[in-house]
Amino acid sequence: MTEQEKIRREKLEELKKLGVNPYPAELFPINNFSIDLIEDYKENSKVTIAGRIMSRRIQGNASFAEIQDSKGRIQVYFNRDEICKDNDKSKYNIIYKKLLDIGDIIGINGRMFKTKVGEITVLVKDFKILNKSLRPLPLPKVDSDGNEYDSFSDLEQRYRHRYLDLILNSQVKDIFVKRTKIINTIRNFLNKKSYLEVETPILQPIPGGASARPFITHHNALDIPLYLRISDELFLKKLIVGGLEAVYEFSRDFRNEGMDKNHNPEFTILELYVAYKDYFWMMDLTESLIEKVCIELNGKTKIQYDSKLIDFKAPYEKISMFDAIKKFTGYDISRMDENELRKICNDMSIEVDESMGEGKLIDAIFGSKCEKKFINPTFIIDYPKSMSPLTKQHRSNPNLTERFELFINGMEIANAYSELNDPIDQLERFENQLELGKKGDDEAMFIDMDFIKSLEYGMPPTSGIGIGLDRLIMLMTNQTSIQEVLFFPQMKPLRNEPVISNDAKIVLNKLQKKGECDFNIFKSEFDFSNKKWDKLTKELRVKDLISISKNENNLLIKPS
């Protein structure tokens, strides 16, 4: 515990002794928000606000402070004689001046006015402590020239402590407000078409609907393995079989795979399935939807993303998978078998392994040489059958499927099919996936016999799509990392700091700065008795924080 934290806890106890509850249970009747008061300023109007103290300037019997609420910040003015009308001035002199800190949350009743320099301000008539903060905020520092430094900007700290990020970096909150607006725009777009929003299981007996490595867990009561869903596709198609002709879900999916700026193991996807439609119809719908999202969020179809100008105005370019590969590599792979594909991968220095079948080899070529080329929205259409085990065979080419993926800024944003509804063909495709699994492909699909059974009862012609919402939100908010658009991105847990005494901390901190050194010389730098020193070194050795060894001449000590 730091000195500041100790002081704040002492203030907490002082408040309690004065009969002030630092964590009151009753509601505080907020009637106003900071930005609204500034934008719709009314002289001398009564206001009730609440928020966190972000700065204070105490000048004897008066003080200016800044309060931050959910919408922004506003200046407030504390005057002792306004707050304390009778002879007892303790609420200002003791509670406000001495026992409150930056970071505390308070409620305020007051009136609006403008200072001599014209700044809109709340004159505090009364205040109430709503929460006593026990840790100081890591606020940026300002040097003598007014330059700000040491801001809360370290990426790892921001992601690990998103609550602080939201308090200290106002632009972060704006990203997540926009995230909700994007999701609501999509939901309204689909609801106006009378499509039905549904929920399907997250824990599944078979991880179906995509080629991906699943997370596995165990259900104790049923004594069976269960998987976190990698996709909700098969369940939504079962609903189409059941007669629900248009269904969608904002799905939380989980894939036990790598992490980078475009991937998080837990992510959000929109899945939509509409009966009696095909992939051409779905392309039109997708264009309309994404164009609308862009306009609703930005007021126009063109946005600046990183250093690029991206235009979301429909219609979007369309190019087949094979044509795209030929355009950017010079190879026509449309008639190549697995061995030929493996050879040209080697020729182009594309990393492959023996577990990869034809579909994954083609995907590797496209991913390595093509996808980064598509900046403006582009539909990649007509995928090989080996890459699309859930997709209907192309109506004019039996080696292809009616599938498209939407690429924007070199990222896959959406994946869509004319859905395979032939149960015999579907079972054969699943069996081919099973063979890939035997070869070592840990992303190969499982066979879902209940899904096959549902198809045998009959699923109407259907088109389906999955849109990666996190990536779409990245684009629309000009963020280059998926972690920026997730409240709590996945992070490796920090090793818990061992609990040690304050004296042991002093010894350890000094040793960590020195590194390995002579035990007796290091010991002489502290004013501890031999008994105390033995106790401290034992404490640190038991926690595996230091090691003591002997060479030919000396006893050595070093941090672990």
What is each stretch, according to the model?
Residues F28, L203, L536, N553-N554:
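Residue-level "edge-of-site" marker
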Residues M1-V499:
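Class II aminoacyl-tRNA synthetase catalytic cores and aaRS-like
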Residues F528-V542:
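Short amphipathic alpha-helical interaction segments
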